[in-house]
């Protein structure tokens, strides 16, 4: 896994947690994006990277789909 080039931003509070949960489940970012797209979220790699890096706001639909893919609750994304 590559290390993050930039520090985390402050546009959201879930990005770091999403990244940690995704890597814990050993899901590559590109595979995760594909799963999101399959579930109806129109997202590209740059936009997703910004979400994990906390440099953009996550939508409610994105949070719902992310929690579903990670088999967790939306609440856990905020912890």
Model-derived regions, located:
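Helix-turn-helix DNA-binding elements, focusing on the entry/boundary residues of the two helices
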Residues: 18, 29, 45, 60-63
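DNA major-groove recognition helix of helix-turn-helix/homeodomain DNA-binding modules
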Residues: 59-76
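A short, Lys/Arg-rich alpha-helix, primarily the initiator
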Residues: 1-25
């Amino acid at each position: 896994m590559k290390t993050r080039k930039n520090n985390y931003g402050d546009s959201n509070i879930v990005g770091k947690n999403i990244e940690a949960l995704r890597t814990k489940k050993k899901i590559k970012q590109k595979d995760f994006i594909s799963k999101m797209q399959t579930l109806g979220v129109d997202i590209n790699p740059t936009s997703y990277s910004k979400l994990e890096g906390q440099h953009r706001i996550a939508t409610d639909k994105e949070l719902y789909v992310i929690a579903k893919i990670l088999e967790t609750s939306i609440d856990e994304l905020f912890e």
